[in-house]
Amino acid sequence: MTSQQIPVRLDALPPFSPVVARLLEELNGEVQSFRRLSLRLSEDPALAAQVLRMANSALYGRRGEVSSLLVAVNLIGIDRLRALVLTYGVRQMFRPVARLPLARRIWRHSLATAILAADFAMDAGGDAMEDYTAGLLHDIGRLVFLVCAPE
């Protein structure tokens, strides 16, 4: 890859989907309405399914099945929803290289780092979401390079 090709390949990186971008904007500000968040989530069926899957996980110990995004958002909470949306958005951006073994290793490492960073932050009284985000994105340059120069 030549130095002239780098900007062209960087421009070819897929951006966050508009739904993910709007959700992150809302989640990083002062959330006005869980109803609006749930309506926004419904615009991306795959993301909505992940939210419902999380709400129905054993972590929340509900007896009945959660089938409403509004109930799921209330149950999960803003911080976990933000982490889920960010993780989903980053993963979608790097879908073009997702099948490469190196990309899978980088992704697993980044996700593990994010989870551990959040766990350490909670133990130390820090900001778990901020540390989760830092852990998730700490190696993003490696994924960008892999997308730009898969050879």
Predicted segments, located by residue:
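Conserved alpha-helical "signature site"
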Residues: 1-151
